[in-house]
Amino acid sequence: MALFHNPEERPYKLPDLCRTLDTTLHDVTIDCVYCRRQLQRTEVYEFAFGDLNVVYRDGVPLAACQSCIKFYAKIRELRYYSESVYATTLETITNTKLYDLSIRCMCCLKPLSPAEKLRHLNSKRRFHKIAGNFTGQCRHCWTSKREDRRRTRQETQV
């Protein structure tokens, strides 16, 4: 992996890094900033499409694997949670339409699509303020959490 000593020349998005290194998302090799393990192909795509930033340590570009992202997102939630509000309240507080707000998933940190924000509004789910930013749940994390709750309930029933 190439070294980037000058911060002004560093690409901070994975597709930009690939262009700089003259490679593709499919062929790039990058390590996790937390566990130092090489990201698997699916994790590279999830990192890129999650619109997350590449970080640099001693000029070496690093990303984050999915297990570390989920782990540190939970730590962030536990440490920095401050409040929960409904979508209509969030629009009132910020004086901005819900669709214009930048909201990420609280579990995997991907940006929420307009459809995912609308799902929160229609099902009367709250957005959570964590570390100064409002978060919700993406479609994938929303459905996987529901399945986990169902499995838990089925296991405890006699």
Swiss-Prot record:
A zinc finger (unnamed) spans 32-68, 105-141. GO terms for biological process: DNA-templated transcription; regulation of DNA-templated transcription; symbiont-mediated perturbation of host apoptosis; symbiont-mediated perturbation of host ubiquitin-like protein modification; symbiont-mediated suppression of host innate immune response; symbiont-mediated suppression of host type I interferon-mediated signaling pathway. GO terms for cellular component: host cell cytoplasm; host cell nucleus. Gene3D superfamilies: E6 early regulatory protein (3.30.240.40). It holds the Pfam family E6. GO terms for molecular function: DNA binding; zinc ion binding. The keyword Nucleus does not apply. A motif (PDZ-binding domain) lies at residues 156-158. Keywords: Activator, DNA-binding, Early protein, Host cytoplasm, Host nucleus, Host-virus interaction, Inhibition of host innate immune response by virus, Metal-binding, Modulation of host cell apoptosis by virus, Transcription, Transcription regulation, Viral immunoevasion, Zinc, Zinc-finger. It is found in: Host cytoplasm; Host nucleus. Belongs to the papillomaviridae E6 protein family. Forms homodimers. Interacts with ubiquitin-protein ligase UBE3A/E6-AP; this interaction stimulates UBE3A ubiquitin activity. Interacts with host BAK1. Plays a major role in the induction and maintenance of cellular transformation. E6 associates with host UBE3A/E6-AP ubiquitin-protein ligase and modulates its activity. Protects host keratinocytes from apoptosis by mediating the degradation of host BAK1. May also inhibit host immune response. This is Protein E6.
